[in-house]
Protein backbone atom coordinates (compact mmCIF):
# COMPACT_ATOMS: atom_id res chain seq x y z
CA UNK A 1 0.00 0.00 0.00
CA UNK A 2 1.32 3.44 -0.95
CA UNK A 3 2.31 5.61 1.99
CA UNK A 4 0.16 8.74 2.28
CA UNK A 5 0.82 12.11 3.87
CA UNK A 6 -1.83 14.03 5.79
CA UNK A 7 -0.94 17.69 5.20
CA UNK A 8 -3.62 20.21 6.23
CA UNK A 9 -3.74 22.82 3.48
CA UNK A 10 -5.86 25.28 1.56
CA UNK A 11 -5.54 27.30 -1.60
CA UNK A 12 -6.32 31.03 -1.49
CA UNK A 13 -8.12 31.95 -4.72
CA UNK A 14 -10.35 34.78 -5.93
CA UNK A 15 -12.67 35.78 -8.78
CA UNK A 16 -9.95 38.01 -10.26
CA UNK A 17 -6.58 39.62 -9.67
CA UNK A 18 -6.61 42.52 -7.23
CA UNK A 19 -8.89 40.76 -4.74
CA UNK A 20 -6.25 40.52 -2.01
CA UNK A 21 -4.90 36.97 -2.36
CA UNK A 22 -1.36 37.93 -1.35
CA UNK A 23 -2.56 40.01 1.59
CA UNK A 24 -4.79 37.20 2.87
CA UNK A 25 -2.08 34.59 2.30
CA UNK A 26 0.54 36.54 4.23
CA UNK A 27 -1.88 37.27 7.08
CA UNK A 28 -2.86 33.60 7.32
CA UNK A 29 0.78 32.51 7.35
CA UNK A 30 1.58 34.88 10.20
CA UNK A 31 -1.57 33.94 12.15
CA UNK A 32 -0.75 30.22 11.78
CA UNK A 33 2.85 30.93 12.75
CA UNK A 34 1.66 32.61 15.95
CA UNK A 35 -0.29 29.46 16.77
CA UNK A 36 2.85 27.37 16.51
CA UNK A 37 1.60 25.47 13.46
CA UNK A 38 4.89 25.68 11.53
CA UNK A 39 3.24 26.68 8.22
CA UNK A 40 4.74 26.48 4.75
CA UNK A 41 3.76 28.32 1.58
CA UNK A 42 3.41 27.66 -2.14
CA UNK A 43 2.51 29.70 -5.22
CA UNK A 44 0.43 28.50 -8.15
CA UNK A 45 2.33 29.20 -11.37
CA UNK A 46 5.79 30.60 -12.12
CA UNK A 47 5.48 34.01 -10.41
CA UNK A 48 8.54 34.83 -8.30
CA UNK A 49 7.38 37.94 -6.42
CA UNK A 50 4.59 36.43 -4.31
CA UNK A 51 6.93 33.71 -2.98
CA UNK A 52 9.30 36.49 -1.90
CA UNK A 53 6.53 37.83 0.34
CA UNK A 54 5.83 34.36 1.71
CA UNK A 55 9.52 33.95 2.52
CA UNK A 56 9.64 37.34 4.19
CA UNK A 57 6.78 36.29 6.49
CA UNK A 58 7.99 32.77 7.29
CA UNK A 59 11.75 33.05 7.02
CA UNK A 60 11.86 29.99 4.77
CA UNK A 61 11.48 29.38 1.04
CA UNK A 62 8.10 29.31 -0.68
CA UNK A 63 7.87 26.96 -3.64
CA UNK A 64 6.16 27.27 -7.02
CA UNK A 65 3.70 24.60 -8.15
CA UNK A 66 3.31 25.06 -11.90
CA UNK A 67 1.20 22.58 -13.82
CA UNK A 68 2.32 24.02 -17.17
CA UNK A 69 6.04 23.52 -16.66
CA UNK A 70 5.67 20.30 -14.68
CA UNK A 71 3.13 17.51 -14.63
CA UNK A 72 0.46 16.72 -12.08
CA UNK A 73 2.49 13.92 -10.48
CA UNK A 74 5.47 16.19 -9.95
CA UNK A 75 3.30 18.95 -8.46
CA UNK A 76 1.90 16.48 -5.95
CA UNK A 77 5.40 15.19 -5.20
CA UNK A 78 6.78 18.70 -4.65
CA UNK A 79 3.89 19.60 -2.35
CA UNK A 80 4.31 16.39 -0.38
CA UNK A 81 8.08 16.71 -0.10
CA UNK A 82 8.13 20.36 0.95
CA UNK A 83 5.11 19.94 3.24
CA UNK A 84 6.39 16.93 5.17
CA UNK A 85 6.61 17.75 8.87
CA UNK A 86 4.70 21.03 8.53
CA UNK A 87 1.52 21.76 10.44
CA UNK A 88 -0.34 23.48 7.61
CA UNK A 89 0.32 24.68 4.05
CA UNK A 90 -1.11 27.75 2.34
CA UNK A 91 -1.11 27.77 -1.46
CA UNK A 92 -1.64 31.15 -3.12
CA UNK A 93 -3.58 31.06 -6.37
CA UNK A 94 -3.07 33.06 -9.53
CA UNK A 95 -5.41 35.55 -11.27
CA UNK A 96 -9.03 34.39 -11.16
CA UNK A 97 -9.91 30.94 -9.91
CA UNK A 98 -10.21 29.31 -13.35
CA UNK A 99 -7.77 31.46 -15.33
CA UNK A 100 -5.21 29.19 -16.94
CA UNK A 101 -3.31 28.77 -20.19
CA UNK A 102 -4.83 29.96 -23.46
CA UNK A 103 -8.29 30.76 -22.15
CA UNK A 104 -8.67 27.37 -20.46
CA UNK A 105 -8.53 26.14 -16.86
CA UNK A 106 -5.23 24.31 -17.49
CA UNK A 107 -2.62 25.29 -14.86
CA UNK A 108 -5.17 27.51 -13.09
CA UNK A 109 -5.76 27.76 -9.35
CA UNK A 110 -8.69 25.36 -9.66
CA UNK A 111 -6.59 22.90 -11.67
CA UNK A 112 -3.93 22.90 -8.94
CA UNK A 113 -6.57 22.51 -6.22
CA UNK A 114 -8.13 19.56 -8.05
CA UNK A 115 -4.78 17.95 -8.79
CA UNK A 116 -3.59 18.14 -5.18
CA UNK A 117 -6.94 17.60 -3.44
CA UNK A 118 -6.71 21.02 -1.79
CA UNK A 119 -9.85 22.94 -0.73
CA UNK A 120 -10.16 26.53 -1.90
CA UNK A 121 -10.73 29.54 0.35
CA UNK A 122 -12.29 32.09 -2.00
CA UNK A 123 -11.45 35.74 -1.28
CA UNK A 124 -14.27 38.05 -2.35
CA UNK A 125 -14.41 41.86 -2.41
CA UNK A 126 -18.08 42.78 -1.88
CA UNK A 127 -18.06 46.42 -2.99
CA UNK A 128 -21.07 47.45 -5.05
CA UNK A 129 -23.01 44.19 -4.84
CA UNK A 130 -25.11 42.14 -2.43
CA UNK A 131 -27.26 39.25 -3.67
CA UNK A 132 -25.35 39.33 -6.95
CA UNK A 133 -22.32 38.19 -4.98
CA UNK A 134 -24.16 34.96 -4.21
CA UNK A 135 -24.83 34.42 -7.92
CA UNK A 136 -21.16 34.99 -8.72
CA UNK A 137 -19.94 32.68 -5.94
CA UNK A 138 -22.46 30.01 -6.87
CA UNK A 139 -21.33 30.20 -10.49
CA UNK A 140 -17.69 29.86 -9.49
CA UNK A 141 -18.45 26.96 -7.17
CA UNK A 142 -20.32 25.02 -9.87
CA UNK A 143 -18.39 26.03 -12.98
CA UNK A 144 -16.22 22.91 -13.04
CA UNK A 145 -16.49 19.52 -11.38
CA UNK A 146 -15.37 18.70 -8.80
CA UNK A 147 -16.19 21.93 -7.01
CA UNK A 148 -13.16 22.76 -4.87
CA UNK A 149 -14.39 25.93 -3.12
CA UNK A 150 -14.93 25.14 0.55
CA UNK A 151 -15.28 28.55 2.17
CA UNK A 152 -15.44 32.31 1.63
CA UNK A 153 -13.57 35.26 3.10
CA UNK A 154 -14.84 38.82 2.60
CA UNK A 155 -12.01 41.29 2.01
CA UNK A 156 -12.19 45.07 2.25
CA UNK A 157 -15.50 44.84 4.06
CA UNK A 158 -17.01 46.76 6.98
CA UNK A 159 -18.43 44.97 10.01
CA UNK A 160 -21.95 46.09 9.15
CA UNK A 161 -21.71 44.86 5.58
CA UNK A 162 -20.20 41.56 6.73
CA UNK A 163 -23.09 41.05 9.16
CA UNK A 164 -25.54 41.70 6.31
CA UNK A 165 -23.83 39.55 3.69
CA UNK A 166 -22.71 36.55 5.75
CA UNK A 167 -26.10 34.91 6.42
CA UNK A 168 -27.30 35.66 2.89
CA UNK A 169 -24.21 34.18 1.24
CA UNK A 170 -24.32 31.10 3.44
CA UNK A 171 -28.02 30.58 2.74
CA UNK A 172 -27.77 31.11 -1.01
CA UNK A 173 -24.50 29.28 -1.72
CA UNK A 174 -24.31 26.66 1.01
CA UNK A 175 -20.70 27.72 1.66
CA UNK A 176 -19.45 28.97 5.03
CA UNK A 177 -18.29 32.57 5.28
CA UNK A 178 -15.25 32.20 7.50
CA UNK A 179 -14.79 35.87 8.26
CA UNK A 180 -13.93 39.26 6.90
CA UNK A 181 -11.14 41.80 6.77
CA UNK A 182 -11.76 45.55 6.77
CA UNK A 183 -10.06 48.00 4.48
CA UNK A 184 -6.70 48.83 6.05
CA UNK A 185 -5.11 51.28 3.59
CA UNK A 186 -1.94 51.66 5.65
CA UNK A 187 -1.44 47.87 5.52
CA UNK A 188 -1.91 47.51 1.77
CA UNK A 189 0.77 45.69 -0.19
CA UNK A 190 1.22 48.17 -3.01
CA UNK A 191 1.22 47.18 -6.67
CA UNK A 192 2.19 48.72 -9.99
CA UNK A 193 1.35 48.06 -13.62
CA UNK A 194 3.67 45.03 -13.78
CA UNK A 195 2.41 43.53 -10.51
CA UNK A 196 3.30 43.74 -6.84
CA UNK A 197 6.26 45.65 -5.50
CA UNK A 198 8.96 43.40 -4.09
CA UNK A 199 9.18 43.01 -0.28
CA UNK A 200 12.23 45.26 -0.14
CA UNK A 201 10.18 48.07 -1.72
CA UNK A 202 7.36 47.85 0.85
CA UNK A 203 8.16 50.02 3.84
CA UNK A 204 7.35 48.40 7.20
CA UNK A 205 6.24 45.10 5.67
CA UNK A 206 6.68 43.08 8.88
CA UNK A 207 4.56 45.52 10.85
CA UNK A 208 1.87 45.50 8.17
CA UNK A 209 1.69 41.72 8.16
CA UNK A 210 1.57 41.66 11.96
CA UNK A 211 -1.34 44.08 11.98
CA UNK A 212 -3.18 42.12 9.29
CA UNK A 213 -2.71 38.91 11.28
CA UNK A 214 -3.99 40.60 14.44
CA UNK A 215 -7.04 41.82 12.54
CA UNK A 216 -7.58 38.33 11.17
CA UNK A 217 -7.50 36.93 14.70
CA UNK A 218 -10.39 39.26 15.55
CA UNK A 219 -12.65 38.91 12.52
CA UNK A 220 -11.81 35.57 10.88
CA UNK A 221 -12.79 32.15 12.21
CA UNK A 222 -9.29 30.70 12.15
CA UNK A 223 -10.50 27.43 13.64
CA UNK A 224 -12.95 27.21 10.75
CA UNK A 225 -10.16 27.94 8.28
CA UNK A 226 -8.05 25.21 9.87
CA UNK A 227 -10.98 22.80 9.72
CA UNK A 228 -11.20 23.52 5.99
CA UNK A 229 -7.46 22.91 5.64
CA UNK A 230 -7.76 19.63 7.52
CA UNK A 231 -10.39 18.42 5.06
CA UNK A 232 -7.71 18.20 2.34
CA UNK A 233 -7.18 14.78 0.80
CA UNK A 234 -4.05 12.80 1.78
CA UNK A 235 -1.08 13.19 -0.58
CA UNK A 236 1.30 10.54 -1.92
CA UNK A 237 4.21 10.60 0.54
CA UNK A 238 6.95 11.38 -1.98
CA UNK A 239 10.54 11.59 -0.79
CA UNK A 240 12.81 14.47 -1.78
CA UNK A 241 14.54 12.48 -4.49
CA UNK A 242 11.30 11.64 -6.25
CA UNK A 243 10.17 15.25 -6.03
CA UNK A 244 13.08 16.31 -8.23
CA UNK A 245 12.24 13.88 -11.01
CA UNK A 246 9.77 14.67 -13.73
CA UNK A 247 9.23 16.13 -17.14
CA UNK A 248 9.26 19.85 -17.71
CA UNK A 249 7.71 21.66 -20.68
CA UNK A 250 9.87 24.53 -21.97
Model feature map: region roles:
Residues 1-10, 236-246:
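Short, low-complexity, intrinsically disordered N-terminal peptides in bacterial proteins
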Residues 120-123, 178-180:
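Short hydrophobic alpha-helical runs that function as membrane-insertion/retention elements
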Amino acid sequence: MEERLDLPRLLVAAPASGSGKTTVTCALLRAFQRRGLDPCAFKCGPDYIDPMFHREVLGLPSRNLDLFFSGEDQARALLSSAGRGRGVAVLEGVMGCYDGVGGTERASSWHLARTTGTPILLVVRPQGAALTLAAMVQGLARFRSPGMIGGLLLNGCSRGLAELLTPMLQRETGLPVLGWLPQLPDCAIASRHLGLLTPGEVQGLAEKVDRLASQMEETVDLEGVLALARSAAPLPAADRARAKIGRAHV
